[in-house]
């Protein structure tokens, strides 16, 4: 049966509204799998102390500050100044040193061959993906590694469903694992690997319970803003309706 019911509840939400919601609430684990997946990745693929790491799309800085606590030299970039401001507050509260930079993943203010590792958590989808991947390659040192956790399309969908999902999230396209691999290879990455094709989580509640964020960075009165809860409700309803089309994976690749 082909599913064509794609109207978003209460009239729909756009990219700015969804990303604004995350910014205003100061969400530190919005990526698929949450902070638990971040911890698991760092256990499974440890980064050596002293490595120079770039986190792209750092948000409120939870991952960046955690890595800094482990003795890693971290630079973190985000396109939204309000996110960088909150990330700096987190770094101060957790007493760690992170270089935070406001900037675009598609045009990063770093020299070639600068970083040993690039960490990305559900950011490339929101950028011009191939352009961002080319930038990751440019600023990595030879032998440097890319770790990028992104949403993937795991089941073919109608164009209307694809359009509705892309419109809500503010992305141009939802890529399959094969399409991500082709993109990485076209950007000159080698040794491309994927860790799983996990079901898309229908809620962040479990991760928030298991890994509560000790630093609260929500805007004042944000929890009383009806527009935020409108977008939150739209997110829940959209994910509940179409989650079977989506998954997520950790992509790993090397600049040789």
Model-assigned labels for residue ranges:
Residues 106-117:
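A short acidic, Gly/Pro-enriched loop at the edge of an enzyme's catalytic core
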Residues 117-129:
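A short SAM/SAH-binding and catalytic strip from SAM-dependent methyltransferases
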Residues 130-145:
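A short glycine-rich, Lys/Arg-flanked "PGG" loop and its adjoining helix->strand segment in the class I
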Residues 195-256:
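Conserved Class I S-adenosyl-L-methionine
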